[in-house]
Amino acid sequence: MASQGTKRSYEQMETDGERQNATEIRASVGKMIGGIGRFYIQMCTELKLNDYEGRLIQNSLTIERMVLSAFDERRNKYLEEHPSAGKDPKKTGGPIYKRVDGKWMRXLVLYDKEEIRRIWRQANNGDDATAGLTHIMIWHSNLNDTTYQRTRALVRTGMDPRMCSLMQGSTLPRRSGAAGAAVKGVGTMVLELIRMIKRGINDRNFWRGENGRKTRIAYERMCNILKGKFQTAAQRAMMDQVRESRNPGNAEIEDLTFLARSALILRGSVAHKSCLPACVYGPAVASGYDFEKEGYSLVGIDPFKLLQTSQVYSLIRPNENPAHKSQLVWMACNSAAFEDLRVSSFIRGTKVIPRGKLSTRGVQIASNENMDTMVSSTLELRSRYWAIRTRSGGNTNQQRASAGQISIQPTFSVQRNLPFDKTTIMAAFTGNAEGRTSDMRAEIIKMMESARPEEVSFQGRGVFEFSDERAANPIVPSFDMSNEGSYFFGDNAEEYDN
């Protein structure tokens, strides 16, 4: 599974395609984006939203959540079998914000899921268009990655909270398919596997019977996905062992935790995709842009170009800084939550600051928040340069880094040294070296210890001017390496825990 995944480009994963050439890929991704845009326009008509309200990111999130909920088969089935008071399993909805007499008002809307599915299919030439749904999921996941630091989830499974740079995609639903698996970080995969093993330890029947067989297949598939993210033979060999274990238990949990730590230096390859909110695609389609004809790529200049000309608004709470809210959404749109802040700042053309220094909470507004004090403001989502999104983890390099987040996961293919604090990481490896995998562990530790600054910096293309659409003239920025580059360094970003 993973080996196929590495040979198909993201766009093919994104569109469930077989091997296609570049033009076909651009067209099928464009078709997917156009479908999301058409759906959004139709929903704005249904909800009687004016142009400004349709460009409000909070309205976009509600509409996106409605369509994801309408197509969530497993949950829909569950809701019908376990009716809960006050929840109609056949309906979906959420808060929609409108301007009334110069004030923002919140109203809850409710729609039949069947109706939403009909509108979605109609916008997608009658198809279910699962690729478009996954695309929306990845956008929500990128927004969560940028907004919340997943320390609690890490601590619960016995991992170090400073490993948050491995946690990309940790809030993606299981049903997000190959495109979703491609953007999950090493830590996310490890966390999912540990949760599974823990269930097996606590529940005797987890691996048994017909259901157990399916569970086992899922377990092995997840192991293969994770194996495919590692770039060294020793890490992959350890994954084979975890996968082949007859009865996964604490030994496997230890191995997985060890592998997650090793990924701080011997980084895994994790894909990055620029997935934008539906309220960006809608107006572009409405203005007559034909995504399918023009073609579109999630990893090239296209999302940057789209953001240069898009007007997106957001509700702002009384003590929030609109510029900070813009940074949050900019990072989410570019999938840059775990990128080095210096690289992001250079590309964006304005300083990108750490999460703990941002005066902004999440983009979504809770139902009990007071609307009287809400204002709206334009999100500044433009960039100075554009860069290609990478899926290589690069190698890391011994520089001074924060005592907080160790290391980063590159988003952009831009050459630089990757800062991290090696002593902090190596300290995590003292102690437990026994167990069946001791020789592999020794080999991995040796590779990490010998990681040398000069051989292991991240090799990338560089950034490009917007006029350079073919990426012919890379500009390689030089960065002040004395500075810290991580976004979450042990600060007090909110948790993502519903």
Swiss-Prot record:
Motif Bipartite nuclear localization signal boundaries: 198-216
Q: What is its main location?
A: virion
Name the segments for region: Disordered. 1-21
InterPro entries reported for this sequence: Flu_NP
Q: Name one GO biological process term.
A: viral penetration into host nucleus
Cell membrane listed as a keyword: no
Q: Which Pfam families match?
A: Flu_NP (PF00506)
Please report the PTM annotation for this entry. Answer: Late in virus-infected cells, may be cleaved from a 56-kDa protein to a 53-kDa protein by a cellular caspase. This cleavage might be a marker for the onset of apoptosis in infected cells or have a specific function in virus host interaction.
Q: Where is the composition biased (Basic and acidic residues)?
A: 8-21
Provide the protein's localization.
Virion; Host nucleus
Keywords tagged on the record: Capsid protein, Helical capsid protein, Host nucleus, Host-virus interaction, Ribonucleoprotein, RNA-binding, Viral nucleoprotein, Viral penetration into host nucleus, Virion, Virus entry into host cell
Q: Which GO terms describe its cellular component?
A: helical viral capsid; host cell; host cell nucleus; ribonucleoprotein complex; viral nucleocapsid
Has the keyword Ribonucleoprotein been applied to this entry? yes
- Provide any one GO MF term from the record: structural molecule activity
HAMAP family hit by this protein: INFV_NCAP (MF_04070)
Q: How does it assemble?
A: Homomultimerizes to form the nucleocapsid. May bind host exportin-1/XPO1. Binds to viral genomic RNA. Protein-RNA contacts are mediated by a combination of electrostatic interactions between positively charged residues and the phosphate backbone and planar interactions between aromatic side chains and bases.
User: Which family does the UniProt entry place this protein in?
Assistant: Belongs to the influenza viruses nucleoprotein family.
Function of the molecule: Encapsidates the negative strand viral RNA, protecting it from nucleases. The encapsidated genomic RNA is termed the ribonucleoprotein (RNP) and serves as template for transcription and replication. The RNP needs to be localized in the host nucleus to start an infectious cycle, but is too large to diffuse through the nuclear pore complex. NP comprises at least 2 nuclear localization signals that are responsible for the active RNP import into the nucleus through cellular importin alpha/beta pathway.
Record protein name field: Nucleoprotein
